[in-house]
Structures are given as structure tokens and as C-alpha cells.
């Protein structure tokens, strides 16, 4: 009898936990930024060589393990065809180095960036901290990226299929360069988008990161309206979404929902990382010896789940069902993904939970969504969006 292939002996998620489980379970394990850089270096080379026979075979095995194909999960939103509603959130593939292979990991879409017009190194290190017990992370990265011109060359080297022809939709998350004065922000965003628009299926206006001084001021309705109007004048402007903070007051959330509707934005992404510490103020970071209350940066992961859900529900109540919403923040299980869809999200995104739980979180969520559709008698995932039906 023939020996089973390695792909059958070890699942992708099993290998991930075997190699990285001990590291991810320890705050003081391998530095999370170094770990991310090592992963992206490997993914970059894989993307560039994806048609080589050996590399292609490995990617095919990963896809067989992690992809799920079910017509009930497919949706067309703001002109983009999503094969499933689970995406990779912005912040991981900042420079788009693995843009061509995210579908192999089961994602229906991936959001690249955040990218700025000027390349920048970001804030001083250490700037990314793992909170293993809480399944969370604290980051103050500061939009470190190679800049829009380098990203364009990086994407072109990967010979991507044209927008609309890709197995995974590619979004572009745009930020303001740190050196650009706030009053010049619209032109700064516009330079990046004008250069990268031909390569993007959609674009996101990121005005909600807590790690660029003054950036959140752009969430003010008048400032954001000015920014949106500047970008929409660009030739070939892709569908525009805005990503908002979880720390907004209810009236500000309502105002942004109304602005998105009035300006014809393609959707809203809720939410970015939070300045709130969600009862973890006294939690000490071993690498600095200081508490979370004393540390700058945005918190992500499981502690953000409830607040992210509240913001999403508020947006849905104000904007109604016509405005597509993307839920992100604390999604680390099929139940959490269903909760967000039931509350009004057409799509969900993963990052911190995906790092902690591993690559099989994506198929686990997709299997869970399919199971819930069956259990509740929904013929399509769109029927579940905003239904308020709980996980069973």
C-alpha cells in the first residue's frame, strides 16, 4: 500500500500549531514583528514562484485543505464578486507581497496595506506586542510600508489577473503619510489611489488608526466629505469604503453612516484597533514592564469583540440594509463570524484571531456558516445578513 502524502498526514493548521503553537502561547516568545516579517518573506517568494511545479503543488495542497466552495456563500457587492465572505484584514500584507496567493488560504478577499504615498518606517520598536492569554495584540506600528510606488511595482511583478478576474478580491487600504500636514491629506491619499487604482478591486479610506498623529480627526464629517470628494474625482476610481474606529461616540457613528449613504460610498468597515483597554489597564507587558494603560497603541483581538459588534449594530440601525458593512475585530471563531453577519455584516475580516488560531480558522468559519445556513433554512448567506438570528 502506498504511503499517504505529507499533505494528508498533516493539515495546514496542524503544521502551523506544531511549529508555532508554543511561540504564540507565550508573550515573550519570538518577537511578533520578526515572526510576521519571516512569514511575509516566505509568502513573497511563494507568490513570485507560484507557477513553479514544486511550489504549485504545495499551494494546491494548501488550497485543497483550506478552501471551501459553496454557491450559497458567493456574493456580488459594490461590483465585486466574492466567492466567500471571509477576508484577510489590512495590516498583515502591508506591501502586497503575497497578493496573488491569498485565495489558496481560503480567503474570499484580502485587503492590502495600509499603504501611504511616502514610504515610511513607522514608529520606533518595539511596537507590536502579543497578549497570549487574552488572544489579543497591542500595536503602534505607525503605517510602516514601502510606499505606493513600490507597492505598484510589487503587484506588477506578481502578474495578477485583472480586477474582476481574480479568485480573491483585492482591496487597497489607504493611509495618510506621516509627513503630510492634515490639511493636505486629500491630495496625499489621492496620489496613492491614482497610482494604484488600476490594480485594486476596491479601496478603503483609513482614517481610524490610532497610531498616526491627527489621523482620527479625518473622521469628522466635514473633513471626511472633503476627502471622499477629492478621491471620487480621480479617473478610474474604484469603489470606496471607509474604515472607522471603535472608540467613536454614537452620534459620530450615526453621522458617518449618514455621510457614507449621502456620498454613495460602497461600504463601511467596522472597526479598527481601539485605544480602550477593555478592563486590561493593569495588564503588564513583559517586554517593557509597563501596563497597557501606560502603553500607546491600538488593541485588537478577542477583547474588542463586543465593542466591534456594538458599532456594527449601530451602523446597521442608522444606515439600513442598503449600505454594505464589513465586520472586523475579535473574530476568532465560526460563532463570532456568524454573530457579525447576523448583526448586519455582509463580509467579515480576520487578522489577530487568524494569527492565534492558525490558517484553518478560515475553513472552520466557512464550514460553520454553511452549517448555520442549513440549520436556519437560509438559501443564501445574504438572507442571514442583518437577520438577528443567533448561532445554534
Curated annotation (Swiss-Prot):
Query: Would you say which domain of life the source belongs to?
Result: Bacteria
**Annotated active site:** 209 (nucleophile)
Which free-text remark accompanies the cofactor? Binds 1 FMN per subunit.
Query: Which pathway features in its UniProt record?
Result: Pyrimidine metabolism; UMP biosynthesis via de novo pathway; orotate from (S)-dihydroorotate (quinone route): step 1/1
Its membrane topology is listed as: Peripheral membrane protein
- Indicate which residues the UniProt annotation says bind FMN: 90-94, 114, 173, 206, 243, 271, 301, 330, 351-352
* Swiss-Prot/TrEMBL cofactor(s): FMN
One MF term from GO for this chain?
A: dihydroorotate dehydrogenase (quinone) activity
Instruction: Name the keywords, alphabetized.
Output: Cell membrane, Flavoprotein, FMN, Membrane, Oxidoreductase, Pyrimidine biosynthesis
Indicate where this protein resides in the cell. Cell membrane
Query: Which reaction is recorded as catalysed by this protein?
Result: (S)-dihydroorotate + a quinone = orotate + a quinol
Q: Which PANTHER family match?
A: DIHYDROOROTATE DEHYDROGENASE (QUINONE), MITOCHONDRIAL (PTHR48109:SF4), DIHYDROOROTATE DEHYDROGENASE (QUINONE), MITOCHONDRIAL-RELATED (PTHR48109)
Question: Would you tell me the protein name for this molecule?
Answer: Dihydroorotate dehydrogenase (quinone)
Amino acid at each position: 500500500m502506498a504511503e499517504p502524502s505529507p499533505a494528508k498526514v498533516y493539515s495546514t493548521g496542524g503544521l502551523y500549531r506544531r511549529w508555532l503553537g508554543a511561540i504564540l502561547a507565550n508573550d515573550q516568545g519570538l518577537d511578533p514583528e520578526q515572526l510576521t516579517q519571516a512569514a511575509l518573506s516566505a509568502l513573497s517568494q511563494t507568490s513570485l514562484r507560484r507557477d513553479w511545479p514544486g511550489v504549485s503543488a504545495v499551494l494546491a495542497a494548501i488550497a485543497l485543505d483550506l478552501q471551501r466552495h459553496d454557491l450559497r456563500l458567493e456574493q456580488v457587492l459594490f461590483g465585486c464578486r466574492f466567492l466567500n465572505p471571509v477576508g484577510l484584514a489590512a495590516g498583515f500584507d502591508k506591501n502586497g507581497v503575497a497578493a496573488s496567493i491569498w485565495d489558496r488560504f481560503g480567503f474570499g478577499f484580502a485587503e492590502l496595506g495600509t499603504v501611504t504615498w511616502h514610504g515610511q518606517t513607522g514608529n520606533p520598536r518595539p511596537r507590536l506586542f502579543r497578549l497570549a492569554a487574552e488572544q489579543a495584540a497591542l500595536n503602534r506600528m505607525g503605517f510602516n510600508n514601502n510606499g505606493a510606488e513600490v507597492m505598484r511595482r510589487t503587484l506588477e511583478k506578481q502578474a495578477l489577473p485583472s480586477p474582476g478576474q481574480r479568485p480573491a478580491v483585492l482591496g487597497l487600504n489607504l493611509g495618510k503619510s506621516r509627513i503630510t500636514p492634515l490639511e493636505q491629506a486629500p491630495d496625499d491619499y489621492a496620489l496613492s489611489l491614482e497610482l494604484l487604482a488600476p490594480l485594486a478591486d476596491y479601496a478603503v479610506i483609513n482614517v481610524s488608526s490610532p497610531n498616526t498623529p491627527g489621523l482620527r480627526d479625518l473622521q469628522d464629517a466635514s473633513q471626511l466629505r472633503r476627502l471622499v470628494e477629492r478621491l471620487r474625482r480621480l479617473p478610474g476610481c474604484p469603489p470606496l469604503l471607509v474604515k472607522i474606529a471603535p472608540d467613536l461616540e454614537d452620534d459620530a457613528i450615526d453621522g458617518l453612516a449618514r455621510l457614507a449613504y449621502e456620498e454613495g460610498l460602497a461600504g463601511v468597515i467596522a472597526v479598527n484597533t481601539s485605544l480602550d483597554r477593555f478592563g486590561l489597564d493593569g495588564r503588564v507587558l513583559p517586554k517593557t514592564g509597563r501596563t497597557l494603560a501606560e502603553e500607546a497603541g491600538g488593541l485588537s483581538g478577542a477583547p474588542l469583540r463586543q465593542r466591534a459588534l456594538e458599532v456594527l449594530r449601530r451602523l446597521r440601525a442608522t444606515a439600513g440594509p442598503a449600505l454594505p458593512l464589513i465586520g472586523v475585530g475579535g473574530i476568532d471563531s465560526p460563532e463570532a463570524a456568524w454573530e457579525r453577519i447576523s448583526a448586519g455584516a455582509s463580509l467579515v475580516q480576520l487578522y489577530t484571531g487568524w494569527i492565534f488560531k492558525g490558517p484553518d480558522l478560515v475553513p472552520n468559519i466557512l464550514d460553520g456558516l454553511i452549517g448555520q445556513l442549513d440549520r436556519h433554512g437560509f438559501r443564501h448567506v445574504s438572507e442571514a445578513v442583518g437577520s438577528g438570528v443567533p448561532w445554534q
